Amino acid sequence: FATTINVINSDNIKIENCNFYYPSASKRMLGTTSGMGSPSVMTFDANSDNNKVEKCLFEYSEGEAIRIKGDNNTIENNYFHHIDWSASELEGLMVSIYCTGDSNTFTKNTIHTTGASATVLPGTASTFSYNKVTNTGLLQSDGAVFQGTKANVANSKVHHNFVYDTDKYAFRYDAPGGDATQAGSFGIMHHNIADKTNGLMIKGNNQIIAHNTIINT
């Protein structure tokens, strides 16, 4: 019940055309409520770089869809829906897709119906592009689809995404504890569309926020 795929000390792996149906679950219904760990679907550890997940289906997982702790990994053209339906025992910031590595790319993915308040924690110097996202953060308050915390803002590139019909912020460059003076800086966010969302939240200095369309907020 720990994970469906666990990549350890491995580089240049490609996971393609895989279907993960109901891939993770705890033993709560069996009365076991301790020592379960987090029921994530796929994990890349900090020593796993230059891997790719492409054209896969992730649906009805109790925990996160993916955890990425390595660098230069790519998540491309996947379909995620009904992810982290319990929003419990998630790692770190508690998001649906969790990245802490450097220079990872999340592109051309479709996401809908998620539980955790924030959908994607991108990692440092990330690229988040050409994604379509809706109906997120159903079990928790606050949050955003793209959740850029202080450490994850610099050199991030957020562009050509369509986020719609969610109560959360579409894109967020945040600061710890709400202290705007501690916010990350030097992020780039351009050519995105947010329709019927909570809009954008941009903190920090020296950000480039250009050519975004925000309607029906």
Model regions and ranges:
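Right-handed parallel beta-helix
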Residues: 11-24, 48-63, 71-86, 100-117, ...
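Composition- and surface-driven signal marking solvent-exposed, interaction-prone regions
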Residues: 3-8, 203-205
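Extracellular beta-strand/beta-solenoid scaffold signature
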Residues: 1-6, 29-45, 60-67, 88-98, ...
